[in-house]
């Protein structure tokens, strides 16, 4: 069995103020989850791709590259990749580069 963390990169509303979190703050929070998951020995961290105002993760490979720079062991994957939005060759190349950056941890 494998255990991991998945984030869709949603911009949640602050329960106290009702305002959406800023993308920069939410990114720091999600990267923190990935670091903690790595430290706790979880197997995989996944991020989703979205293109709307409620989400900030339009490029999973970029977010996962930032994750790779902060983690040592956890495997990195995209929870969703929208094939209709991106050139398939470009997606392959981005994840091949991520695999090099992460020293073989990209899936």
Where are these regions (language model features)?
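Flexible, glycine-rich active-site loops centered on histidine and acidic residues
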Residues: 2-23, 84-107
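Acidic, glycine-rich active-site loops and adjacent beta-strand->loop/helix elements
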Residues: 50-53, 80-89
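A short, GP-enriched loop/loop-strand-helix hinge that lies immediately N-terminal to
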Residues: 75-81, 107
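N-terminal beta1-alpha1-beta2 module of alpha/beta enzyme domains
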Residues: 1-77
């Amino acid at each position: 069995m494998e255990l991991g963390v998945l984030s869709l990169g949603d911009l949640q509303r602050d329960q106290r103020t009702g305002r959406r979190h800023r993308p920069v703050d939410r990114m720091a929070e999600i990267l923190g989850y990935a670091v903690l998951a790595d430290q706790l020995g979880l197997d995989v961290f996944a991020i989703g791709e979205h293109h709307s105002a409620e989400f900030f993760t339009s490029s999973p490979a970029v977010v996962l590259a930032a994750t790779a720079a902060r983690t040592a062991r956890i495997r990195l994957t995209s929870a969703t990749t929208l094939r209709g939005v991106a050139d398939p060759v470009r997606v392959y190349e981005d994840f091949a580069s991520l695999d090099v950056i992460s020293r073989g941890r990209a899936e």
